[in-house]
């Protein structure tokens, strides 16, 4: 019996591959409006501060490959073939869908490398993928709205956080706080009933409970430079507030809305948040990002296989 082939559409934000890409990348994010030159120079300086460019492109590709390998290791009913589609730089989501179509893929599971649902993120990825498939006449794409509650994903973060707190002397632990964060979005999503903020709060509670952490708070980071209000509190403001009002002197940052080392973590956390902790004389900690950790890849594989199984009747 010939094993069935299914597409694995891995979608992610994308990042500039070289400094020359920065302008066009951010122009795409801004819906075709070129960023002011001052902003471009600021972005270039941020990338240089983390070593030149973000490691995200390489990590995303490696995550997608490892996920494909893992899916084909843990079951033998179907052969998953991976296609990478990015939101703001090539290969675009539409390019990946076109390649699937050209390869004769009839069915695919689409997963976005972001755990929480929002209209700005997950929905926009999934809609672009489905629109591209509809235009081409296939494949059928089974999309995934969120996977923040996948047990192995929560386990990954709980283990990382627990290890940091366990290594602290008891007196330090008593005055330590966990800050769980994700990328801020415009506040208007709340009026639209978007579940994004609630999902982050749920994630934070589950991780703190599993890690046995008594003190935790939810913050937002990396807000866009636009006049409209964004979700808060910002993690830097939250750090100062927790220090001034609660007297915490050790801060553990878990940017769980992200899945890899990239600018928002390596700069916004490791440089900007760290500067705040240094200003107030506090300690800074940040667990390792999931990247290609086997437990995290297993979490993604579980999510994909559950979604594939939900469509089981169609596979007969």
Curated annotation (Swiss-Prot):
Gene3D superfamilies: 3.40.50.1400. Fe(2+) binds at residues 183, 264. One of its GO terms (molecular function) is ferrochelatase activity. It is found in: Cytoplasm. Its EC number is 4.99.1.9. Keywords: Cytoplasm, Heme biosynthesis, Iron, Lyase, Metal-binding, Porphyrin biosynthesis. Fe-coproporphyrin III binds at residues 13, 30, 46-47, 54, 125. One of its GO terms (cellular component) is cytoplasm. Pathway: Porphyrin-containing compound metabolism; protoheme biosynthesis. GO terms for biological process: heme biosynthetic process. Involved in coproporphyrin-dependent heme b biosynthesis. Catalyzes the insertion of ferrous iron into coproporphyrin III to form Fe-coproporphyrin III. Belongs to the ferrochelatase family. This is Coproporphyrin III ferrochelatase. It comes from Geobacillus kaustophilus (strain HTA426).
């Amino acid at each position: 019996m010939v094993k069935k082939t299914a597409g694995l559409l891995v979608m992610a934000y994308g990042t500039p591959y070289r400094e020359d890409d920065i302008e066009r990348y951010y122009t795409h994010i801004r819906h075709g409006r070129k960023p002011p030159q001052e902003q471009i120079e600021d972005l270039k300086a941020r990338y240089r501060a983390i070593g030149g460019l973000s490691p995200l492109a390489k990590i995303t590709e490696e995550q997608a490959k490892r996920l494909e390998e893992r899916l084909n290791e843990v079951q033998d009913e179907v052969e998953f073939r991976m296609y990478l589609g990015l939101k703001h730089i090539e290969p675009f989501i539409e390019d990946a869908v076109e390649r699937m179509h050209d390869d004769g893929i009839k069915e695919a599971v689409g997963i976005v490398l972001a755990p929480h649902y929002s209209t700005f993120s997950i929905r926009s990825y999934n809609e672009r993928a489905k629109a591209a498939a509809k235009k081409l006449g296939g494949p059928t794409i089974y999309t995934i709205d969120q996977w923040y509650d996948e047990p192995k994903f929560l386990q990954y973060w709980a283990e990382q956080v627990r290890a940091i707190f366990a290594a602290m002397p008891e007196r330090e632990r008593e005055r330590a706080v966990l800050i769980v964060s994700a990328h801020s979005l415009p506040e208007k999503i709340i009026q639209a009933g978007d579940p994004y903020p609630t999902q982050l709060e749920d994630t934070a509670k589950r991780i703190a409970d599993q890690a046995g952490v008594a003190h935790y708070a939810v913050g937002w980071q990396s807000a866009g430079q636009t006049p409209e209000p964004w979700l808060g509190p910002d993690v830097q403001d939250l750090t100062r507030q927790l220090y001034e009002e609660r007297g915490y002197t050790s801060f553990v940052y878990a940017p769980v809305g992200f899945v890899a080392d990239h600018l928002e973590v390596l700069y916004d956390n490791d440089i900007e948040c760290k500067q705040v902790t240094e200003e107030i004389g506090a300690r800074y900690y940040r667990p390792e990002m999931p990247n290609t950790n086997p437990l995290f890849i297993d979490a993604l594989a579980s999510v994909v296989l559950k979604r594939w199984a939900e469509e089981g009747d169609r596979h007969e």
